[in-house]
Amino acid sequence: MTVPPVILIDILKRPSLLTSLSEQHQSAILTEARHVNLLGQLQYLCHQHDVFDDLFLHSQQTLLSGQQAHLAQCKQLNDYHNVLTQALTQATSTWSYINQAGIQFSQQQSRLGYLRQTTEILVSHNAIHHIENCLLTHGWRPKLISDYDEKSRIRYTNALSPFIHQESNLELVVHYQLLPKRFRYSNNDTFTRKLIYPDSCYPASIFDPISTIYHLAINLFFINDSKFGLRDIFTLYSLLNENSLQEGFWGELLTFQNKVGKDSSLFLALHFCHVLFDLAIPDFVSQYYHQQFKVSVTLNSLETSYIDLFSYAFPPYQDDDYKLAARLLRIRGCIKQMPLYLLLPHIIKRGIWNCLPHESEEELIC
């Protein structure tokens, strides 16, 4: 399929473009948005830029369905929180909702329309076995995983295998450390998060905006968890753009970067948010990152691959360049997460594993 001259990533940068498209082209954009879980956020964006009323009726109805899905998921998350609280309070006094669930529990405008795939929590390493037993006795069961990449990701990201709640089908991922095992501070990562305690998820906590931004950047650019790459980079842009209005935000961000050292995840997040969505970055922040990182070497090798990955994730647009970019970035993620002597066996095992027949995910969840 030939890629149209205007695709979703163009609309996210300039929502007004949507009003100049035919009804069929608008429908194609919204289909792409639904595929990458951005339909609800696009609806909010259209209202924010006063273009919603100028769209075709069918497009308005489709966008409203994304908003309704978001509202239903927020209500569902509150119900899930009650189920989790019942199970976890017997094993631990507190836990943190992280990544997608943490964003939905936050009170920021950037969460409006946001849809998550899984619910992830962070617990104390010392309580992990007690928590696992409590989940098993409260209607949870381990999820069978047939995808080798997902099995490897869990192995190298300090998480238990996901759990499925037998009644609600909630999928839960329990982390006992946040940073990947090969990361410099993986065994002592408490300085990478600052907790806040909204009433909506008591007695649990969520991360403050800078901690949330950093760990989203780690997932996208260190672990290379890019299945929903466009949604995640746009979420990073939304969080950065909204919080940049707060006095002292950029100074706090650079202080945070000094603590984590040479990891380039935040740098890459800022760069691609600027390139793709025109994020306004102060000169002193740009100068800092240009001094800290070998910008030309880092970006020349990554920029084209990441832009292809973010732009053409919709299956009809996936050409050979996209597939090559996805493969190269997956290998980059493997290299970052495991020693080199394990990389070749991993690639061989992945090829063999994914050629074998496995039960479908639908069969496993039912």
For each feature predicted by the language model, list its residue ranges.
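Conserved NTP-donor binding/palm subdomain of two-metal-ion nucleotidyltransferases/polymerases, i.e.
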Residues: 1-117, 123-366
